[in-house]
Amino acid sequence: MYCRMEFNFFMNDVVQMARKEMVESGYDQLTTPEEVDEVLKEKGTVLVMVNSVCGCAGGIARPAAAYMKNYDKKPDRFVTVFAGQDKEATARAREYFKGYAPSSPSFALLKDGEIQMMVERHEIEGHEPIQVVQKLEKAFDQYCS
């Protein structure tokens, strides 16, 4: 029982640090299905980062997400949902990612509520952050003003 409590405290710290990293990078955290709908139904472009506690999220996806806030062309909104934590919000966001299997970490670029492109876990895990950045830059160039 003691080990389980220690593990839970450790995981809570990991989750809080992962959340904090995204918020400090300038992403709005969506924690409810209602918040997801409110943002994703808006006109304009939105980058959704599906956050997670796995190593490729911390070592690749979150650094790429932070970097993209400084790119010349940007979506209107940068938001994040947290897979495995805010389960209902994440499930609702994934309803907008038509044609893509659930994957975390991942990035989805939407325009006027419609999915335009996705960077899935298999395109993140085992890759360098710059490779993820390049995919996102290409999408921003194509879909963002």
UniProtKB/Swiss-Prot annotation:
For this protein, the record's InterPro entries field holds: BrxB/BrxA
**Highest taxon above the source species:** Bacteria
Disulfide-bonded cysteines: none
What's a single GO BP term from this record?
cell redox homeostasis
Sorted alphabetically, which Pfam families does this protein's record hold? Disulph_isomer
Record family assignment: Belongs to the bacilliredoxin family.
Its name, as the record gives it, is Bacilliredoxin BH2759
